[in-house]
C-alpha cells in the first residue's frame, strides 16, 4: 500500500433515468456478474411498482427507506490480550449508505415473491414503513453495539 499520497475516489456518474448518484450506486450494488443493464431493469421496475403502490414519488420512498435502514453504529472485532471484544464504532456517512443498500438487496433476495423487482419493491415499501428484514438487521446491529458499550474505550 503506497504511503505517499491519498488516492482520489472514483467519481460515480448519476443514473440515466432519475439523474441520481445514490441510485447509480444502488444499481451497482444490486448488479451480479457485471450485468448492469439487468440490474437497471430490476431497479426501475421496482421503483415503478413502488410508485403504483405508494402513490408517491419513488425517489422519496427510496430515500426514506434508506434513511430507515442506515446504521449509526456497528461493532468491529478487536483482539486484546487473547480475548476478542466486539467494539462499537460510529459508521462513516459513506459506509452508512452503502451498508443500507447492501442490506436492502440482501433482504430482497431472501424474500419469496416471484421476480426480483417485486421482491425489491416489497422490501423498499417495508423499509419505508419502518419494518422488514433490512430494518431488523439495523436494529440488531444497534442492539449489538449497545450491549458492547462497555468496550467502547478500545476504539482505535
Curated annotation (Swiss-Prot):
GO BP terms: translation
Any Gene Ontology CC annotation: small ribosomal subunit
Domain of life of the source: Bacteria
Cited Pfam families: Ribosomal_S7 (PF00177)
Keyword annotations of the record: Ribonucleoprotein, Ribosomal protein, RNA-binding, rRNA-binding, tRNA-binding
Molecular function GO labels: rRNA binding; structural constituent of ribosome; tRNA binding
Family the UniProt entry places it in: Belongs to the universal ribosomal protein uS7 family.
PANTHER family: RIBOSOMAL PROTEIN S7
NCBIfam families the record matches: rpsG_bact
Function: One of the primary rRNA binding proteins, it binds directly to 16S rRNA where it nucleates assembly of the head domain of the 30S subunit. Is located at the subunit interface close to the decoding center, probably blocks exit of the E-site tRNA.
Assembly notes: Part of the 30S ribosomal subunit. Contacts proteins S9 and S11.
Name this polypeptide is given: Small ribosomal subunit protein uS7
Amino acid at each position: 500500500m503506497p504511503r505517499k499520497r491519498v488516492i482520489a475516489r472514483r467519481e460515480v456518474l448519476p443514473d440515466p433515468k432519475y439523474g441520481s448518484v445514490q441510485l447509480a450506486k444502488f444499481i451497482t450494488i444490486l448488479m451480479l456478474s457485471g450485468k448492469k443493464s439487468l440490474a437497471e431493469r430490476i431497479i426501475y421496475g421496482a421503483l415503478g411498482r413502488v410508485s403504483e403502490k405508494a402513490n408517491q414519488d419513488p425517489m422519496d420512498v427510496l430515500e426514506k427507506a434508506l434513511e430507515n435502514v442506515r446504521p449509526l453504529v456497528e461493532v468491529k472485532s478487536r483482539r486484546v490480550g487473547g480475548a476478542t471484544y466486539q467494539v462499537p464504532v460510529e459508521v462513516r456517512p459513506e459506509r452508512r449508505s452503502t451498508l443500507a443498500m447492501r442490506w436492502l438487496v440482501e433482504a430482497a433476495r431472501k424474500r419469496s415473491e416471484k421476480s426480483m423487482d417485486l421482491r425489491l419493491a416489497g422490501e423498499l415499501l417495508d423499509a419505508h414503513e419502518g419494518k422488514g428484514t433490512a430494518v431488523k438487521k439495523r436494529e440488531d446491529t444497534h442492539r449489538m453495539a449497545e450491549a458492547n458499550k462497555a468496550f467502547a474505550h478500545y476504539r482505535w
